[in-house]
Regions:
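Basic, short loop/linker segments at the boundary and entry of helix-turn-helix/winged-helix-like folds
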Residues: 2-49
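Polybasic low-complexity intrinsically disordered regions
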Residues: 32-33, 49, 83-199, 208, ...
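Short helix-capping/linker segments at secondary-structure and domain boundaries
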Residues: 50-56, 251-255, 276-278
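Short, hydrophobic/amphipathic alpha-helical patches that form generic packing surfaces
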Residues: 40-50, 267-278
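Catalytic-loop motifs flanking and including active-site residues across diverse enzymes
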Residues: 36-42, 168, 239, 243, ...
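Short, solvent-exposed helix-loop connector elements
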Residues: 26-29, 130-131, 224-236, 249-267
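Helix-centered, glycine/charged polyanion-binding patches within enzymatic domains
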Residues: 186, 191-249, 253
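Short, positively charged, Gly/Tyr-enriched micro-motifs
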Residues: 32-97
């Protein structure tokens, strides 16, 4: 009887091989050579996948022989080592890891759906916050571009809310366009993305400011969206809502880091490990 392989082992293997392709083994010639950079990066990605703290991840690795074998670790990295590794994570590195993975999978999409979702700035429960009377007037946002066919995250970025999603439109478009059908792909999004940078063919419902629509191009776009709704194509937007739900259920709906710069990295990390997961 064939033994079933753990999902954790599969994720560790994909993350480790991905990091090996992108990152050099050591940061400098006189590195201690106890761990390679790909090993440590893969451990941090796996830490977010299993939703463990730095200290708990150290203990989890001690009990996970199959994962240790997959990562080729000769010893277990200390929790402080994992912390320093995530500190070295830069958004450019995360985006390079994402591009490398997607270039291997080669998605080619006709429709790409944009959406944002909010992440709590604290790990405290809603009950605790209600009892102590503490309120937060902001949250962190992850903006994701999801392919309709592949349901992969083709582009991701982070920001802070509350606020309009219009600022996410063009950055997501620039990052995702390499995975769209040349000259044919289109953007699907809700009216929160209704910005002046909208292009011809974008399926984004215009906002009725004052209840009346006067500009011909906005009326034309409203008719285009209405036709797409009748055809059922605009209904494919639900796929990005599913992706948002998976990210929050599997990897948490909160931001764990206390450092401001690392807080903005976490929504992008969650997008990367989602692609590794699926």
């Amino acid at each position: 009887m064939q033994k079933r392989e753990s999902k954790y082992v599969i994720v560790a293997r994909i993350a480790y091989r991905l990091c090996q392709r992108v990152v050099a083994p050591y940061s400098h010639l006189k590195s201690p050579h106890r761990f390679t950079q790909p090993q440590l990066l893969a451990c941090v990605l796996l830490m977010f996948y299993v939703r463990k703290s730095y200290r708990d991840m150290e203990e989890w690795l001690l009990a996970s022989d199959a994962v240790i074998k997959e990562l080729e670790l000769k010893e277990i990295p200390d929790h402080s080592t994992l912390n320093r590794t995530f500190k070295r994570f830069r958004i450019k590195l995360l985006e390079k890891l994402q591009r490398t993975l997607l270039d291997e999978l080669q998605p080619n999409e006709l429709g790409i759906v944009f959406d944002t979702t909010g992440f709590s700035p604290t790990q405290a429960s809603v009950h605790y916050l209600a009892r102590c009377g503490r309120k937060y007037d902001h949250f962190y946002k992850g903006g994701y571009a999801v392919g309709i066919e592949s349901q992969l995250i083709l582009a991701s970025m982070s920001g802070q809310g509350p606020g309009a999603d219009t600022g996410f439109l063009e950055p997501l478009r620039r990052k995702a366009r390499r995975y769209g059908l040349r000259g044919k792909w289109m953007v699907l999004a809700d009216s929160g993305f209704d910005a002046i940078t909208i292009r011809l063919g974008d399926l984004i419902p215009p906002i009725r400011r004052g209840g009346v629509m006067k500009l011909p191009e906005r009326i034309e776009r409203m008719e285009l969206v209405s036709a797409a709704k009748l055809d059922g194509y605009f209904g494919q937007r639900w796929k990005v809502e599913t992706v948002n739900s998976v990210i929050k259920r599997k990897f948490g709906d909160e931001i764990r880091s206390r450092n401001l710069f690392r807080r903005y990295r976490e929504p992008i990390v969650k997008g990367l490990i989602y692609n590794i997961h699926v």
